[in-house]
C-alpha cells in the first residue's frame, strides 16, 4: 500500500508541544521553564523531519513552531517580570520596616537546624533513650512509643539549645524500628545516634543519671557533663520500678523530676494523680529548664492538667 504524505502532515503535531501548559513552573539551569527547553529541542526535530517532506509542508512546520515559540517567550518574559517586581516589592518593604526580620527559606532553616544538632553532638547535653525494654510492650504500646520518639525529635529540632539524642539498645530488625519507619516520615534521616549497645556500656557509669519517677532524689539541675537516660517504656499495665531496678543493677545514679517540690495534687472527679510521663513530655521539661533555669515554667510545659497536678503558686 502506498502512503500519501500530502495533506496529512498538517495533523502532525509534536506531543511535547501539546502538553507544555501543565509544567510552566519547572525551570531548568538557565532559568527557563523545562517546557520551553523541550520546545526548542522538539523544534529542531520537526525541522529535520520537514526536510524529507514537501517544501510547502516544511514552510508550514517552521511557521507553526515559530508561533509556538513566540507564545512561550511571552509567557517566560511575563514570569521574569513578575519575579522582578516581587523582588523589588520585598526590598521596598524591608527598607520601610527595617525592624522586621526577613523570612528565611525552608532550605536555610533546615541547614540552620542541622548545624545546631551537629554542634550539640560535639558540645551539647546528651540524652539517651533506653530502648532495651521493648519486650515488655505490645504492638499498640510500640506504636505509641514510636509516636513519642517522633514528637521528642521534633521538639529537639525546634529547641534553641538542643540535646544530642542517642537511641540505645535499638536494632534495625526490631518491631519498634519497623513502627518508627512506618509512622515517622524521614525517620532514617533523623540526626541522632542509633546503636544496639546499651547506654551502660557506651558511657562511663559515673556520668549517667537515669530519670525515673521511682527515684528518691529530685533532679535539681541539668548538668552538661552528665548523660541523662529516659526509659523507652510505654506500659499501660504500669509495671512498677522497671527502670529504677535496671539503674540499680548497674549502680547508676537516679533522679526524678521535681514535681513534688513545685507542684501539688489538684482535686478532680476521678481522684487521679500520676507522675508517669511520656518520654517527649519529660524531654520538653528538660529542654525548657535548660533554656530558662526555671523549674515551675519547665514543669508547666510538660506536666499536663490530666496528670492531676498544678503548680503551687496556682493554689496560693
UniProtKB/Swiss-Prot annotation:
It comes from the Eukaryota. S-adenosyl-L-methionine-dependent guanine N(1)-methyltransferase that catalyzes the formation of N(1)-methylguanine at position 9 (m1G9) in tRNAs. Probably not able to catalyze formation of N(1)-methyladenine at position 9 (m1A9) in tRNAs. GO terms for biological process: protein insertion into mitochondrial inner membrane; tRNA N1-guanine methylation. Pfam families: tRNA_m1G_MT. Residues 73-97 form a coiled coil. It is an enzyme of class 2 (transferase). This is tRNA methyltransferase 10 homolog B. Residues 77-98 are annotated as: Disordered. Keywords: Coiled coil, Methyltransferase, S-adenosyl-L-methionine, Transferase. It catalyses: guanosine(9) in tRNA + S-adenosyl-L-methionine = N(1)-methylguanosine(9) in tRNA + S-adenosyl-L-homocysteine + H(+). Its EC number is 2.1.1.221. Belongs to the class IV-like SAM-binding methyltransferase superfamily. TRM10 family. GO terms for molecular function: tRNA (guanosine(9)-N1)-methyltransferase activity; tRNA binding. GO terms for cellular component: cytosol; mitochondrial inner membrane; nucleoplasm; nucleus; TIM22 mitochondrial import inner membrane insertion complex.
Amino acid at each position: 500500500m502506498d502512503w500519501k504524505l500530502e495533506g496529512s502532515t498538517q495533523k502532525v503535531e509534536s506531543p511535547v508541544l501539546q502538553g507544555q501548559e501543565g509544567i510552566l513552573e519547572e525551570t531548568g539551569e538557565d532559568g527557563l521553564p523545562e517546557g520551553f527547553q523541550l520546545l526548542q529541542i522538539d523544534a529542531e526535530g520537526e525541522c529535520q523531519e520537514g526536510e524529507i517532506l514537501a517544501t510547502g509542508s516544511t514552510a508550514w512546520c517552521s511557521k507553526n513552531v515559530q508561533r509556538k515559540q513566540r507564545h512561550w517567550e511571552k509567557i517566560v518574559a511575563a514570569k521574569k517580570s513578575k519575579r522582578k517586581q516581587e523582588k523589588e516589592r520585598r526590598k521596598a518593604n524591608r527598607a520601610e520596616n527595617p525592624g522586621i526580620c526577613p523570612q528565611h527559606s525552608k532550605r536555610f532553616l533546615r541547614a540552620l537546624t542541622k548545624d545546631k544538632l551537629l554542634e550539640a553532638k560535639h558540645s551539647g547535653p546528651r540524652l539517651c533513650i533506653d530502648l532495651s525494654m521493648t519486650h515488655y510492650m505490645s504492638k499498640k504500646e510500640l506504636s505509641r512509643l514510636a509516636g513519642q520518639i517522633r514528637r521528642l525529635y521534633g521538639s529537639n529540632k525546634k529547641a534553641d539549645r538542643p540535646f544530642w539524642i542517642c537511641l540505645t539498645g535499638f536494632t534495625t530488625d526490631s518491631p519498634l524500628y519497623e513502627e518508627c519507619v512506618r509512622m515517622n516520615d524521614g525517620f532514617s534521616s533523623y540526626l541522632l545516634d542509633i546503636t544496639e549497645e546499651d547506654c551502660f556500656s557506651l558511657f562511663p557509669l559515673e556520668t549517667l543519671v537515669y530519670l525515673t519517677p521511682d527515684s528518691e532524689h529530685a533532679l535539681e539541675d541539668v548538668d552538661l557533663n552528665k548523660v541523662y537516660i529516659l526509659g523507652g517504656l510505654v506500659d499501660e499495665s504500669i509495671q512498677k520500678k522497671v527502670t529504677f531496678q535496671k539503674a540499680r543493677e548497674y549502680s547508676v545514679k537516679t533522679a526524678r523530676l521535681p514535681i513534688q517540690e513545685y507542684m501539688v495534687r489538684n482535686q478532680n472527679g476521678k481522684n487521679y494523680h500520676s507522675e508517669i510521663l511520656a518520654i517527649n513530655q519529660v524531654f520538653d521539661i528538660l529542654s525548657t529548664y535548660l533554656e530558662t533555669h526555671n523549674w515551675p515554667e519547665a514543669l508547666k510545659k510538660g506536666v499536663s492538667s490530666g496528670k492531676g497536678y498544678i503548680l503551687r503558686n496556682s493554689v496560693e
